[in-house]
């Protein structure tokens, strides 16, 4: 702190002469003090319904000065003088100054006359003295007071805020953050402190002044512009304004403390009243529950059944487990609440709580003791009754269990013993029934002990006077009667089963013999029927003769088969005789086979019917095979002549196409003679087609008399026609090429010789490698380097545009003719158009129509693009691009 700060801190109540000199040194301070002191005075005078406008004028008569002192001190001053004379005014001011002096304040150099005369310095000094005495002197923080106390209070309140460092009452407040921090510390909802900036003091100061005036009832005692524009704000003005914050916030804190004290007292009283109500209700509920429970525990009427007594025990357990524990907790909580309530009343100087009559803790303890005494006796009675009934219930349950097991075992046994299932059973079933019956007899003997135990238990229950003895006796008697009846039925069933077994054993032997002989005979008949009905497929006379021989051998075995059939039927008749004699009720058929006599007779009759049908079918097939053989021979004779003829013609045409005898016209004439002879041969092909149609209708699939099929003949004939036509066309094209390109016969022969030389397989085409070798032989320089490969690829694209991988002789001739003959080019056509155009770079539609035929002129006009050169005229056409397009060098 600088020297000025130290002086101000130690001498805040310094004589007026000192602060008078300070005031004269800085007019800005005087301005700040006038505004601040005026606002401070008005903040108190408004409580009396008045205010001042000019601090040195409005206090001159002493009336408002006395009123100000009465407001801030809360005391009454002497009655003021109401006169308007100077003496009256001085008297009133002196009364005010005397009151100030009575408060222990020394007034040095301040006289009533200066105040009445409107001396600004003296008036401000007097007001500052009043502010120090009534607004600042009583401030006390820890061991400091007055100015030091106010400064310490500001430092404590603003300590948590960034960029706030209060060290004095002048420059520490220039940025306005100190005022904003004081407001935010006590009323954080009024200012968003986080948005404030230290470099914007005007906004900070105005924000604090506006908020303090609007929400804290602290008048605006300072101007933000004066504080910011002054190097050192007036300390007295700042202290006066800050003291208003102190009193505003300290008053609010006192009110809050008083309200908290009242709320605390009321809360304690309300809590005690609630505890009293809770005790009364809890005590009433607990006593009512005890009153209802004791009669239930005193009821000792015994039950006849164990179930009923167990239900009572279960109810008692529920009482112990579910109902009583919460009540024990309630009783304990009741005592705790009572003791807690009494303690709280005693600590808060309230009278002790006295519950309603009959609801004292001792009353509840007495009722609870009665409950537990009755409860103990009830539990002993329950256990004794349960032990008493337990023994009877055990015997009764044992009787019921054994009786139920026995009845479940005997259920259906009488019906089983009475049934006559053996009358329709097979031998194996009879043996199984006997085994089953023996097992039942063993089981019956084992159940004898249980029947005796049931009777003994029933006797004991009667002796113990069981309450339900009549039903036990009736059930026991029924079991004994049923047991005697089961014994008689068991013996009767055994006798019937043994008698039936003997008869069925005899029948079973006959069934077995029948099955052993019927099965192979049935298989023989089924095989015979399959063979007789088998659809045979033969293609030769030898095959049908073999089938006929096998059929005759089969017919020779039929007499012996008929004897076996009669023997098998005799066995079945013997079984029928035994069944009729002894009245055996057969439940099923022969267990060893499913073949019946009716089935044997039916199949035998079917075999006898199929034999003559087979004879007829074999005879008809033999005649058909003889006819087919004649067709084979007829077709073979013709095919063996036509096939070689076609092959010969194909070879002759091939020789003509590659030989170089005579001119091309001679070759063409020779080929046309061949074509005529081939056409004249067509009737023989048609006749062969007719014979082939007959063979197909007869379903003949092979022919040992020839190696030629109709398909071979057709393919050969079509190839022959195609070959002669293609060869004639090739020769005609060669003639056209020769004439158009001016190729001599010698050149044509040379080309043919070279082509034939490299056509190793005589296919009429050259592969890429063969074609390359042919070109080299003709003098073309085609190497294996990249340039040579590119040249050969170009040539191949010309001779094989479809990329088939072969070069025909015609393509070879076309290529060679282009290479050796003079042909039209795009340049020649352009030169011709230039002549028609009069040596211009374009041509007009009129010129085209004048020089060319109409259709060709219109063709050119439709396809020529407009000419766009610098010498163009309306309607000019570009004949140059048209000419290049004709030869594929550009798009048409």
Curated annotation (Swiss-Prot):
Signal peptide: none annotated. Residues 31-135, 144-250 form the Calponin-homology (CH) domain. Keywords: Acetylation, Actin-binding, Calcium, Cell junction, Cell membrane, Cell projection, Cytoplasm, Cytoskeleton, Disease variant, Membrane, Metal-binding, Phosphoprotein, Repeat. The modification N6-acetyllysine is found at residues 95, 195, 676. Residues 1-247 are annotated as: Actin-binding. Ca(2+) binds at residues 759, 761, 763, 765, 770. InterPro entries: Actinin_actin-bd_CS, CH_dom, CH_dom_sf, EF-hand-dom_pair, EF-hand_Ca_insen, EF_Hand_1_Ca_BS, EF_hand_dom, Spectrin/alpha-actinin. Spectrin repeats lie at residues 274-384, 394-499, 509-620, 630-733. One of its GO terms (biological process) is actin cytoskeleton organization. GO terms for molecular function: actin filament binding; calcium ion binding; double-stranded RNA binding; integrin binding; protein homodimerization activity; structural constituent of postsynapse; transcription coactivator activity; transmembrane transporter binding. F-actin cross-linking protein which is thought to anchor actin to a variety of intracellular structures. Association with IGSF8 regulates the immune synapse formation and is required for efficient T-cell activation. Homodimer; antiparallel. Interacts with MYOZ2, TTID and LPP. Interacts with DDN. Interacts with PSD. Interacts with MICALL2. Interacts with DNM2 and CTTN. Interacts with PDLIM1. Interacts with PDLIM2. Interacts with PDLIM4 (via PDZ domain). Interacts with IGSF8. Belongs to the alpha-actinin family. This is Alpha-actinin-1. It comes from Homo sapiens (Human).
């Amino acid at each position: 702190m600088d020297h000025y700060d130290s002086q101000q801190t130690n001498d805040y109540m310094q004589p007026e002469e000192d602060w008078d000199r300070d005031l004269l040194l800085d007019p800005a301070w005087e301005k700040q003090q006038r505004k601040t002191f005026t606002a401070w005075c008005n903040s108190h005078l408004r409580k009396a319904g008045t205010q001042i406008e000019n601090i040195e004028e409005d206090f001159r008569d002493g009336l408002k000065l006395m009123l100000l002192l009465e407001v801030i001190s809360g005391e009454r001053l002497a009655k003021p003088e109401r006169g308007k004379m100077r003496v009256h005014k001085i008297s009133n001011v002196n009364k005010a100054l005397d009151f100030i002096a009575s408060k222990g304040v020394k007034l040095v150099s301040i006289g009533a006359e200066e105040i009445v005369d409107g001396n600004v310095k003296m008036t401000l000094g007097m007001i500052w003295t009043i502010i120090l005495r009534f607004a600042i002197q009583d401030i006390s923080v820890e061991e400091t007071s007055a100015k030091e106390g106010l400064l310490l209070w500001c430092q404590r309140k603003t300590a948590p805020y960034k960029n706030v460092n209060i060290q004095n009452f002048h420059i520490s407040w220039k940025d306005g953050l100190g005022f904003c921090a004081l407001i935010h510390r006590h009323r954080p909802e009024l200012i968003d402190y986080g948005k404030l900036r230290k470099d914007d003091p005007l906004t900070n100061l105005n924000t604090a002044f506006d908020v303090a005036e609007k929400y804290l009832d602290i008048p605006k005692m300072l101007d933000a512009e004066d504080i910011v524009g002054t190097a050192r704000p007036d300390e007295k003005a700042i202290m006066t304004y800050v003291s208003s914050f102190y009193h505003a916030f300290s008053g609010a804190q006192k009110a809050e403390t008083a309200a908290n004290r009242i709320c605390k007292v009321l809360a304690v009283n309300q809590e005690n009243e609630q505890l009293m109500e809770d005790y009364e209700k809890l005590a009433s509920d607990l006593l009512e529950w005890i009153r209802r429970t004791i009669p239930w525990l005193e009821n000792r009427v015994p039950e006849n059944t164990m179930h009923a007594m167990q239900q009572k025990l279960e109810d008692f357990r529920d009482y112990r487990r579910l109902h009583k524990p919460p009540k024990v907790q309630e009783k304990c909580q009741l005592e705790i609440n009572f003791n807690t309530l009494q303690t709280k009343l005693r600590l808060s100087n309230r009278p002790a709580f006295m519950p309603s009559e009959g609801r004292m803790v001792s009353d509840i303890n007495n009722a609870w003791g009665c409950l537990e005494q009755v409860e103990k006796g009830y539990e002993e009675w329950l256990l004794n009754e349960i032990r008493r009934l337990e023994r009877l219930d055990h015997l009764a349950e044992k009787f019921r269990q054994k009786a139920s097991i026995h009845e479940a075992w005997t259920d259906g046994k009488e019906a089983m013993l009475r049934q006559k299932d053996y009358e329709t059973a097979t031998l194996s079933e009879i043996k199984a029934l006997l085994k089953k019956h023996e097992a039942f007899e063993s089981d019956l003997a084992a159940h004898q002990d249980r029947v005796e135990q049931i009777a003994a238990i029933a006797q004991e229950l009667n002796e113990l006077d069981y309450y339900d003895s009549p039903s036990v006796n009736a059930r026991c008697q029924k079991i004994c009667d049923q047991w005697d009846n089961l014994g008689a039925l068991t013996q009767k069933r055994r006798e019937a089963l043994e008698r039936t077994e003997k008869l069925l054993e005899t029948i079973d032997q006959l069934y077995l013999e029948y099955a052993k002989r019927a099965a192979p005979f049935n298989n023989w008949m089924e095989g015979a029927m399959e063979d007789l009905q088998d659809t045979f497929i033969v293609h030769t006379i030898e095959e049908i003769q073999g089938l006929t021989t096998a059929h005759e051998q089969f017919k020779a075995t039929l007499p012996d088969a008929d004897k076996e059939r009669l023997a098998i039927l005799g066995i079945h008749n013997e079984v029928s005789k035994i069944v009729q004699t002894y009245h055996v009720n057969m439940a099923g058929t022969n267990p060893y086979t499913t073949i019946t006599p009716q089935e044997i007779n039916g199949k035998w009759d079917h075999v006898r019917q199929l034999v003559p049908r087979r004879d007829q079918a074999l005879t008809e097939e033999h005649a058909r095979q003889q006819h087919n053989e004649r067709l084979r021979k007829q077709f073979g004779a013709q095919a063996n002549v036509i096939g070689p003829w076609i092959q010969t013609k194909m070879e002759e045409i091939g020789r003509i196409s590659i030989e170089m005898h005579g001119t091309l016209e001679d070759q063409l004439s020779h080929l046309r003679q061949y074509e005529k002879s081939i056409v004249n041969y067509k009737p023989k092909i048609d006749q062969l087609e007719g014979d082939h149609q007959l063979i197909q209708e007869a379903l003949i699939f092979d022919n040992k008399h020839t190696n030629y099929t109709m398909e071979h003949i057709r393919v050969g004939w079509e190839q022959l026609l195609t070959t002669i036509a293609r060869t004639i066309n090739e020769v005609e094209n060669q003639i056209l090429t020769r004439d158009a390109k001016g190729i001599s016969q010698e050149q044509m022969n040379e080309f043919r010789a070279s082509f034939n030389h490299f056509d190793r397989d005589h296919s009429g085409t050259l592969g890429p490698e063969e074609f390359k070798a042919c070109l080299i032989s003709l003098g073309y320089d085609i190497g294996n380097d990249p340039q040579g490969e590119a040249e050969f690829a170009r040539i191949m694209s010309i001779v094989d545009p479809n990329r088939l991988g072969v070069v025909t002789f015609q393509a070879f001739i076309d290529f060679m003719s282009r290479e050796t003959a003079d042909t039209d080019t795009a340049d020649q056509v352009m030169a011709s158009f230039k002549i028609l155009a009069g040596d211009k770079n374009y041509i007009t539609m009129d010129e085209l129509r004048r020089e060319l035929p109409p259709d060709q002129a219109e063709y050119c006009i439709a396809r020529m693009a407009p000419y766009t050169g610098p010498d163009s005229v309306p309607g000019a056409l570009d004949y140059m691009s048209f000419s290049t397009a004709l030869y594929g060098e550009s798009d048409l």
